[in-house]
Design a protein with these regions (language model features):
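Extracytoplasmic/secreted proteins, especially bacterial periplasmic and envelope-associated proteins
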Residues: 65, 70, 92, 96, ...
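Short glycine- and hydrophobic/aromatic-rich loop-to-beta-strand nucleating segment
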Residues: 144-146, 264-267, 271-272
């Protein structure tokens, strides 16, 4: 019997359960136990291979299901003690997952894509290949591109051709340097969003602006001291920049691509293969946390939990507005009135958010090809598909959903969400990725 068949055989015997999370991950920096409430006791009758997993998180909205899973007991309900540790940066998270919990690091956690795929290939881990599995999407939307008040007269917006024609060329001519735009980790989600926004407006991000990496916690100070004029990251940081009157929200990622994929839960494959029942328990707890987060009546409680010093250490009003999608858009601060343009955790107009559609995880690899992020690793569509098929585990999500008792019509069975359309009119058809790449006018 092959390793994979043994794994599936174990899955077939996994007991049905529900989900709860308790939490403390003893991995520096800033390891935390549960936030302001008493952790729920871990169920002792779950018959899991292990009752503990160590996960890393970055304090932005994408991590909310992990924190809520701990605080509200969803993971613990399924017999799993999820120990969360706040990571100082995405680079620290990468280094810690390479170490693994047995080496004092983490087993997995929250990731920008394609970080898990590239860690699996050794492309961002100094050549050390640490195979990982992408298990679920944590959130959709909830990110934005903030601009400094120093360029408020530039009126940067989603549609730069209309609001700010020739802005970047004029800026360079006036200031004697290029406009600086930052992100939190190179060659992943947040750099991809700012690149897509610029390129979709006819601005070549490799020629017309200077792109740089700045850790999320340094966002506010960086904007204040002029390190950068724009920043792409997850809320609450863009919203806080606007609320603190340091800058304004030029565009949200929901405007760039409605119901877009965001960050994902991914875990080392050796942990998953060794602990198939615990993996299913983890997914069930995550799903219940995502369902809870998506209910409007829970937004204020979620904000209160997340705002605590143990978790995000961010003012409560900022998180309340961020979780509800109460943005003020553009230099004029126009209120966003559609809650569906804010962060979504379980359901959207396109269906289930948590399910890791391969069509969506593939897109990040296609963008990596577009910008030649990982030469020698992702140069062709065939390479991208092979990596994607190896890392993205839709089958585990489906198994967990069935055990959780979700109705059959709420459990996706395919690997594609269908055609996707972006703000610039470009369409991504997962059945024809080459057509998507060919349609992109600006690329490397």
């Amino acid at each position: 019997m092959t390793k994979r068949r043994r794994f599936l055989a174990l899955l077939s015997g996994t007991l049905a359960s529900t989900v709860v999370l308790t939490g403390c991950l003893g991995n520096p920096p800033n390891s935390t136990s549960s936030g302001g409430t008493t952790p729920a006791p871990v169920a002792t009758n779950a018959n899991l291979e292990t009752n503990t997993i160590n996960l890393g998180f970055i304090p932005i909205l994408e991590a909310a299901p992990l924190v809520i899973g701990v605080e509200k007991g969803f993971f613990a309900k399924h017999g799993l003690d999820v120990k969360l540790s706040k990571q100082a940066s995405w680079g620290a998270a990468r280094d810690n997952v390479v170490l693994g919990s047995t080496g004092g690091g983490i087993d997995g956690g929250q990731w920008q894509l394609p970080m898990p795929q590239m860690i699996s290939e050794g492309a961002i881990s100094n050549g050390k290949k640490v195979p990982m599995y992408v298990l679920a999407m944590l959130m959709s939307q909830g990110n934005g591109i903030a601009a400094s008040n120093t360029v408020k007269d530039g009126n940067l917006s989603l549609d730069l051709r209309k609001s700010s024609p020739d802005f970047f060329a004029k800026y360079q001519q006036k200031e004697g340097r290029k406009f600086r735009a930052a992100y939190t980790f190179p060659k992943a989600n947040q750099e991809i969003w700012i690149r897509y926004w610029l390129a979709g407006n006819g601005v070549d991000p490799d020629k017309s602006v200077e792109l740089l990496k700045v850790p999320a916690p340094e966002t506010l100070q960086g904007m204040k001291n002029g390190t950068m004029e724009a920043f792409s990251t997850g809320d609450p940081w863009p919203s806080r920049i606007a609320k603190d009157n340091i800058g304004y929200l030029a565009a949200t990622t929901a405007e760039i691509w409605k119901d877009h994929p965001e960050e994902y839960l991914a875990v080392r494959s050796d942990w998953v293969d060794k602990n198939p029942k615990a993996t299913i328990a983890l997914l069930k707890g995550l799903m219940e946390a995502q369902m809870w987060l998506d209910k409007p009546e829970n937004k204020d409680e979620a904000a209160k939990i997340l705002s605590s010093r143990k978790w995000y250490n961010v003012p409560l009003p900022v998180l309340q507005e961020s979780l509800k999608g109460q943005y003020k858009i553009g230099a004029a601060g126009t209120p966003e009135t559609d809650p569906k343009m804010g962060p979504l955790y379980w359901a959207s107009d396109r269906g289930n958010i948590s399910y890791p559609y391969k069509s969506l995880t593939l897109w990040f690899l296609l963008e990596s090809m577009r910008w030649k992020f990982y030469p020698g690793t992702v140069d062709t569509i065939e390479q991208a598909k092979a990596i994607n098929d190896k890392v993205t585990r839709e089958d585990l999500w489906q198994q967990a959903a069935k055990e959780l008792g979700l109705p059959a019509n709420q459990i996706p069975t395919g690997s594609s969400r269908g055609k996707e359309t972006f703000f610039d009119g470009v369409t991504y058809d997962p059945e024809n990725p080459q057509a998507y790449l060919s349609a992109l006018k600006i690329k490397k």
